[in-house]
Amino acid sequence: MGSSSSRVLGQPRRALAQQEQGARARGSARRPDTGDDAASYGFCYCPGSHKRKRSSGACRYCDPDSHREEHEEEGDKQQPLLNTPARKKLRSTSKYIYQTLFLNGENSDIKICALGEEWRLHKIYLCQSGYFSSMFSGSWKESSMNIIELEIPDQNIDVDALQVAFGSLYRDDVLIKPSRVVAILAAACMLQLDGLIQQCGETMKETINVKTVCGYYTSVEIYGLDSVKKKCLEWLLNNLMTHQNVKLFKELGINVMKQLIGSSNLFVMQVEMDVYTTLKKWMFLQLVPSWNGSLKQLLTETDVWFSKQRKDFEGMAFLETEPGKPFVSVFRHLRLQYIISDLASARIIEQDGIVPSEWLSSVYKQQWFAMLRAEQDREVGPQEINKEDLEGNSMRCGRKLAKDGEYYWCWTGFNFGFDLLVIYTNGYIIFKRNTLNQPRSGSVSLRPRRSIAFRLRLASFDSSGKLVCSRTTGYQILILKKDQEQVVMNLDSRFLTFPLYICCNFLYISPEKGIENNRHPENPEN
């Protein structure tokens, strides 16, 4: 489906016979085919001939003998044509109904008035609408009225949307432009046109992009299209960080951003610190929507603005101020333990003064106990899949591969002595536990075996942000010896589309029961 789509909508064919009967009664005399009728109308029909000739005055009959030989020759030539199929395009019944009954309003038995316009329609067609079916079959006073004034309380509905909605009752297909789909959906929901509602949903799902996603998401929350809402969330999870956009940041509301940041399916680029940076830029644009700079300028302008706020609020954490309180519920979904595990990131988040120090203190304590367990308590990593732990507490990180080639990288941060090296080569994605073979700035664990829980996802997108291809390992437990390599995904590089995006979830150490999690209880007011 491109910018528009179509869907077959059922029509009451019984109504067709009733409406066409009147149209035929008004028609003038038909054109005759043969015999005396033909003569009276000035036409001559010659058997075997292909032409009808108009006479001047009375009918002039043809001499069959004069044409016999010619007809025999033509008959021989035309014999093959008798066995050759031919097509003749007939006028569509649906088009006839739409033009004659809807656009022209012939044989109308009811007039619908709304938004300063009127439509001459037919009750038998309107009964396809749940709204009008109830009106005409119930005890409403409108059931016996010939003129009905419709009140339109929904501001999304306009005259053009009503035109499409009413017209859908008279035709087999409806073309819906993405720019008009929200208004048409609103009209379809009001009139209870299930077929048109479904088609609007399909149009939305096929045309989600950076310009439409927020408008679609808002509208389907109102009108209850859960499948479209799910598609919008999937698009946002995939594109929020991989294809950052100033306009998108401005349009994303607090509730939807809370869902995105809290999800383990967020396609993170780089590390959790970049999730924090994305949130910081988004919050700035929510507070200063008039800013119209470029994406490259955004982070610098954001840091300057929050620096001024720190001075104005005398060192108070921004999320504790009145302007910052509405954003608390979103920032609580940050996985702070993976930010403070890197020195540079820990310094930045402390200096920004956005997150309250109490939040950070509890995470420092939690990570200190986890480090002691890894060093002194024979902790070798997760031994079984705990989906709740993985989805709520795993490290989120990612990488963009611009083109095919060989890549070697590791993500920053202290991971309890587990130095994981990621390799992409010839369509293989390999995890290697680095201990002695590669240089390492921090300490590494020399335990014979270490285990991690992980999930790897791979994706590529088209220009609209739609998923072109994707692969996932699902959640797994991987046990590696010192300097051991393990292929975790095998791809056919001939069929890969670049740039390629790789996103991983890791859990290096199991959360200890009884130790407070870094996730803060939700404030009901937020």
Swiss-Prot record:
What's the source species for this entry? Homo sapiens (Human)
User: What name goes with this protein?
Assistant: Germ cell-less protein-like 2
Give its localization.
Nucleus matrix
* Keyword terms: Developmental protein, Differentiation, Nucleus, Spermatogenesis, Ubl conjugation pathway
Bias-annotated ranges (Basic and acidic residues): 62-77
Q: How does it assemble?
A: Interacts with CUL3.
Q: Which GO cellular component term is one of those annotated? A: nuclear matrix
Q: Which stretches does the entry tag as region Disordered?
A: 1-85
Pathway of this protein? Protein modification; protein ubiquitination
Q: Does the record's keyword annotation contain Cell inner membrane?
A: no
Further comment: According to some authors, GMCL2 is a GMCL retrogene on chromosome 5 which is likely to be functional.
Tell me which Pfam families the record gives.
BTB
Q: Name one GO molecular function term.
A: cullin family protein binding
What the protein does comes down to: Possible function in spermatogenesis. Probable substrate-specific adapter of an E3 ubiquitin-protein ligase complex which mediates the ubiquitination and subsequent proteasomal degradation of target proteins.
Free-text tissue specificity from the UniProt record: Expressed predominantly in testis.
Give GO BP annotations, semicolon-separated: germ cell development; protein ubiquitination; spermatogenesis
Q: Where is the BTB domain?
A: 108-178
Q: Does the keyword Transmembrane helix feature in the UniProt annotation?
A: no
| Placement of sequence motif Nuclear localization signal | 49-55, 85-91
Superkingdom of the source species: Eukaryota
